[in-house]
Design a protein with these regions (language model features):
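Membrane-embedded alpha-helical bundles of multi-pass transporters/translocases
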Residues: 1-244
């Protein structure tokens, strides 16, 4: 099993897509774990208000599903992912510098974040399946299960790293869970942990996907090559060297 994992990680396509996943999920873990602190201490929201904003966040995420799906009909998954993440990254950095001072601001931030968040959960699993076919073409092995399990391991690792980083940030900022009011430094860092810090990890995810070589055209070529191989014709792998 570990030998197969090692062989998979030698492939550029696998490294790029796993890197994109790991970086996004670290930022996602920080964003999700920080929300309650930010809403409670920075925004002084009541339990009812927090419930409403969480419901709005969920509604926005669901609303983006058909939009992301529609975008992939016009441009490929890779380009849609990059564009969505850039929108979220830029928007969250702007909010990080301007600050969030109202309930409406939280709603707008949620809208901006959900662009990239929805793109990740909708597109990256499909992109991972594209990697499975690239692996089959280049290595003559059907290892979809191994690729998916590797992704599951990376998700668990990313969540752990994100939560550890969140804990370190709060500790260094002087955050105290027992205090009714936090220091200015602690609230400054809970603000950054909801905006700029997740945006940094989104940007790293974008860089990985920019490097990721499977475009819509390349994927079509991979499927054609696999079809020729199954028909008994050995395809020329030279055009696919960048997948390796």
């Amino acid at each position: 099993m570990f030998r197969n994992y090692a062989q998979l990680m030698k492939m550029r396509t696998v490294r790029d897509i796993m890197g994109a996943s790991v970086f996004f999920l670290i930022g996602y873990a920080i964003f999700c774990s920080d929300r309650m602190y930010f809403f409670t201490y920075n925004m002084d929201m009541s339990g009812a208000e927090i419930t409403v904003i969480m419901m709005i966040f969920t509604f926005i995420a669901v609303a983006f599903i058909p939009l992301i799906s529609g975008a992939t009909r016009w441009i490929d998954k890779r380009t849609t992912y990059i564009a969505s993440m850039i929108i979220s990254t830029v928007g969250m950095v702007i909010f990080g510098f301007l600050g969030i001072r109202s309930f409406a601001g939280v709603v707008v931030l949620s809208l901006i974040y959900c662009v990239g968040n929805s793109a990740y959960w909708q597109l990256l699993p499909a992109m991972i399946y594209d990697v499975c076919e690239a692996d089959e073409l280049m290595n003559r092995k059907e290892r979809a299960g191994m690729v998916i399990s590797l992704q599951a391991l990376s998700e668990a690792l990313s969540e752990g790293i994100g939560l550890q980083l969140m804990g370190i940030i709060l500790s260094l900022a002087g955050f105290s869970g027992d205090a009714e009011v936090q220091t200015a430094t602690a609230m400054h860092w809970t603000g950054l942990s909801l905006t700029i810090i997740p945006a940094v990890f989104m940007a790293l995810s974008v860089i990985c996907v920019i490097r990721y070589p499977i475009t819509k055209k390349v994927y079509g070529d991979v499927l054609d090559a696999l079809a020729r191989r199954k028909a008994g014709e050995e395809p020329d792998l030279e055009p696919f060297r960048k997948l390796k």
